[in-house]
Amino acid sequence: MVDRKSLVNEINKGCNSQSFLRCLNDKVEFVKEIREIYEQSFKMYAQEITARKMDTIAALENAFFRLDRDLSAEALMHRNARTFAVAMSGAVACVAFLENRNLYVANTGDSGAVLGSLNSDGKWIARRLTNEHNTDNVSEINRIIAEHPKQERDTIFRQERLLGQLLPTRAFGDFRYKWTAEVIQDFVCFRSSSSSSILLYPALFDVPTRNSYHRLNPSDKFLILATDGLWEFLTPSQVVGIVGEHLANKKFLEPLRLSGQNMTLGDIALQLAQRKANQRNRPLDQNSATHLLRVALGGTEYGIEHSKISHLLSLPKDVARLYRDDITITVIYFDSDNIGKLPKASSG
């Protein structure tokens, strides 16, 4: 994370928003027609946050609310097909920020974060750091019902979706469900001329985020961030167990290292024999996220079935969503030896 002083210096140098982006796989560029609009929003936001002092939790919450508010303002102030396409679309997010031993997680929607820890008995423990924002979460249902008139109580949720359409109950964008009927009538034209396309009351209000805080311990080994597509296949406990097992077996993908300096030929032979015996546990993937994806898509009670993976990945786009959702996984490993040496700064 860029600190306040560095951000001010970069702004004074005339930086743009992409100066702070790092993409691992693809080149990231804003659509030409709306690039300048986003740059204006970024500069205004950057100037405001450098003039305000906020603790970490407040900064994360403010960032979520501000992004959603800007998406709405950009569409209403700069009316064109591009800005409205963004405003009508929806996106969820799950963000983690690590500062010394302080781990902060913020999310909106149905992506999730799970912490993997190893207890004193050598067993993997899964700790959910986020709550799903969908109809599986009773508190979410109660929250939305409380925000609506009584006459909508029996119709706001249908087929386990908001208005029978939206699966996440919190998201960026999706302003068709957030703007008032007056705004929709004045600015938006749906293909359907039916009055049912316009809601009498907004179905969603803002994009409230949920934050969590955890102080890391040496027993905390990794953090998994993933979209809902993964959690539809595997539970948090299963995910942590799979990553933990992969972490233990990944050493067999590395070159053999002798365990001591004064080893005899017999010691070396024993180590080689043990390595050979454990080769059956050798994973196919060096990357834990790739391994997790392979198990999610191809796992069976008899092991990984690669034909199942091939089938799920080769489905046509128009039917793929009926069988699997898009899956994005990030696995972050912690240096257990170093965690105990870090300062125990207070949360905030």
What are these language model-derived features?
Residues 1-348:
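PP2C/PPM-type serine/threonine phosphatase catalytic core
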